[in-house]
Amino acid sequence: MNDSEFHQLADQLMLYIEETLDGFTGDSDIDYETNGGVMTLTFENGSKIVINRQEPLHQVWLATKAGGYHFNYRDGHWYCSRSGEEFFAKLSEAATTQAGEEVSFSE
């Protein structure tokens, strides 16, 4: 993949997250902000999730209270370089924990 393809895929990922949060109907207030390719989700309890694109590596990084994860794109999805877990599964798990209620980003 070249840099242009990477940015297109990362943009699609972040847009999907924004659209999902805009449609979230739970009790928790989850704010998001995107600045310079970094998306920060902020939860009512003050905790944060940070999603960051790493252009030189063509990776998307996810930082949660539980730890940091690096994702590579293959076969139409982003997968963790260590566990093989799919990005939206890991994001849903982390957001659910940090929001205190179910938050699903499943496609």
From Swiss-Prot:
Function: Involved in iron-sulfur (Fe-S) cluster assembly. May act as a regulator of Fe-S biogenesis.
A cellular component annotation (GO) from this entry: cytosol
Protein origin, superkingdom: Bacteria
Family: Belongs to the frataxin family.
Pfam family name, one: Frataxin_Cyay
UniProt entry tagged with the keyword Cell inner membrane: no
Protein name (record): Iron-sulfur cluster assembly protein CyaY
GO terms of biological process kind: iron-sulfur cluster assembly
Annotated source species: Yersinia pseudotuberculosis serotype O:1b (strain IP 31758)
